[in-house]
Amino acid sequence: MYKPFLEFLEKELFQRFDLQSRVIPPGLEFKVSDRGRNPATIRSWCYQSQELRKIRYTYIDAGESAQIFNSVVYPSHNYDLPLLGIDFLSFGKVKNLIVLDFQPLFQDEDYQNKYIAPLKYLHNKYPDLAQNLEMKFYDANQYFSKYLLFAKTDAETVSTRVFEAFQDYLNLYWQMLADAQALHDPEDIQRIVKAQKDYDQYSADRDPASGLFSSYFGHEWAERFLHEFLFEDAVPLAVSASKR
């Protein structure tokens, strides 16, 4: 269901940026599960460029049982742009959940006006995809913008409205990146480093997908995937607790 989204993202990335492959830890790039009614495959890709230090995207194909496309784009540490977050999930062809956002690193007014306010036009363009659903695992005020698209919808809407919104959000993000001024002050850069690490930690501690990964691919593999690839700057809770 979400293969056209993956293909569009990939085409955009290769056309716009001088990409280099980024190493995915052994055993995490691809895996097949024989659990459940439909075998599931998970495949991930990871790249970097001068402007973007980590571009990761993952596709889970479990046939009619599940189709999942997830991606996060991390700007280089000398840019204070939000992260681009994409999470599209379908279960049994009837439950379709889409999340698309510029995920802010900071909440101060200047930052919000600079990077989040420009999203308002697109948010208003897709009111049917901005459903103000409850976030069960996250604080909506942390690492999410007030103009995120967050909706439960049907397969036809995914292929039309959601795909159109996806293209619009990507185009605005690329434009913001092109217009961004690189930071050179070491203190500014360290602030970005910390903010992106904090994002990884926050996300790894709360990501509800870890249970899904475990159900398909086993707990040990899921933990590695979460902490060595998806959110590699996060410290596993057991490790952080032992250091106290």
From Swiss-Prot:
Pfam families reported for this sequence: Fe_bilin_red
Reactions catalysed, as given in the entry: 15,16-dihydrobiliverdin + oxidized 2[4Fe-4S]-[ferredoxin] = biliverdin IXalpha + reduced 2[4Fe-4S]-[ferredoxin] + 2 H(+)
BP GO annotations: phytochromobilin biosynthetic process
EC number: 1.3.7.2
One GO molecular-function entry: cobalt ion binding
Keywords, comma-separated and alphabetical: Oxidoreductase
Family annotation (HAMAP family): PebA (MF_00792)
Protein purpose: Catalyzes the two-electron reduction of biliverdin IX-alpha at the C15 methine bridge.
Family: Belongs to the HY2 family.
Designated name of the protein: 15,16-dihydrobiliverdin:ferredoxin oxidoreductase
Organism this protein belongs to: Nostoc punctiforme (strain ATCC 29133 / PCC 73102)
Name of the encoding gene: pebA
